[in-house]
Amino acid sequence: MLFRSEEVGFVPKPLVDTTQRHMKAELLGHTYNAPFGFAPMGGTSIASYQGDLVLARAAANANIPMMMSGASLMRMEDVRAASKTAMFQAYLPGDEDRISETFERCAKAGFETIAVTVDVQVAANRENNVRAGYNNPLRPTPQLAWDCMLR
């Protein structure tokens, strides 16, 4: 058994000074105002104009963590410029040259933290996206407008 409830408990401390309480948390050498932030979400620009820039600016203003998705529709350089503590989540292709290019571009953009995502062993077959007319970056098409109206 991985978790035994009898080994975990809360210890109340009712007689302590609470005038200086805060939610600050340190993560990877940076102190943030909260122990939570924006997770990597590919395609936020579909939901909001320049969605990743909006999130990066909000994270910078609130001093909370923000990780840019490798599936973002925004340029990493622009997102990093909007938030000096933004991190980058990379889906690495199986090609060493492209991996090196990704890391070099992240370094040039100023990213200090890169999270490497390793949830699949083989790159996805995107034939269904091609047949459906999906392209990245997303471009307005009559079919896209029709799909949006239907949903």
Predicted features, each with a name:
Residues 36-39, 64-68, 86-90, 114:
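Hydrophobic faces of well-ordered beta-strands that scaffold small-molecule active sites
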Residues 47-52, 68-88, 92-101, 105, ...:
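Active-site-adjacent beta->alpha loops and helix N-cap segments on the catalytic face
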